[in-house]
């Protein structure tokens, strides 16, 4: 009898779908000093996470030196997935990646906020539905 009850419970469990929303893009013509400002970039990523209704776990950043390849990378781990900014100040260029899992978060609002703070002369934005179907 116990076994039958266990089977009944297993059959009534509803699987939660995997919702994946990925927004990413390239920013051109960004101020070089801003792209080198590790502290400000960290702050922008943290603010973007809150705006997008994400739950921040940890933020790490790195400064890379090496001529025309120098830059800053900021990566925020959020419960829902991640936000990343990678910069190339010499080229006035940055890439932004915002990926979330779940219905409640809005990666596009995080991307738009980052763009508003970096003020590129132009940018591209891409969206990919990475949900399990």
UniProtKB/Swiss-Prot annotation:
Site (Cleavage (non-hydrolytic)): 80-81
Family annotation (SUPFAM superfamilies): S-adenosylmethionine decarboxylase (SSF56276)
Protein keywords: Autocatalytic cleavage, Decarboxylase, Lyase, Polyamine biosynthesis, Pyruvate, Schiff base, Zymogen
Active site: 81, 86, 101
Cofactor notes: Binds 1 pyruvoyl group covalently per subunit.
A single GO BP: polyamine biosynthetic process
Enzyme Commission code(s) on record: 4.1.1.19
Keyword Lyase listed: yes
Protein modification: Is synthesized initially as an inactive proenzyme. Formation of the active enzyme involves a self-maturation process in which the active site pyruvoyl group is generated from an internal serine residue via an autocatalytic post-translational modification. Two non-identical subunits are generated from the proenzyme in this reaction, and the pyruvate is formed at the N-terminus of the alpha chain, which is derived from the carboxyl end of the proenzyme.
Cofactor(s) needed: pyruvate
Enzyme class: lyase
GO cellular component: cytosol
Any one Gene Ontology molecular-function term assigned to this protein's record: arginine decarboxylase activity
Positions in coiled-coil regions: none
Pfam family, one: AdoMet_dc
InterPro entries documented for this protein: AdoMetDC_fam_prok, ArgDC, S-AdoMet_deCO2ase_core, S-AdoMet_deCOase_pro-enz
The protein's annotated pathway: Amine and polyamine biosynthesis; agmatine biosynthesis; agmatine from L-arginine: step 1/1
Highest taxon listed in the record's lineage: Archaea
Modified residues (Pyruvic acid (Ser)): 81
NCBIfam families, per database record: SAM_DCase_Bsu
Family: Belongs to the prokaryotic AdoMetDC family. Type 1 subfamily.
Function: Specifically catalyzes the decarboxylation of L-arginine to agmatine. Has no S-adenosylmethionine decarboxylase (AdoMetDC) activity.
Assembly behavior: Heterooctamer of four alpha and four beta chains arranged as a tetramer of alpha/beta heterodimers.
HAMAP family the UniProt entry points to: AdoMetDC_1, ArgDC
Name of this protein: Arginine decarboxylase proenzyme
Organism whose genome encodes this protein: Pyrobaculum arsenaticum (strain DSM 13514 / JCM 11321 / PZ6)
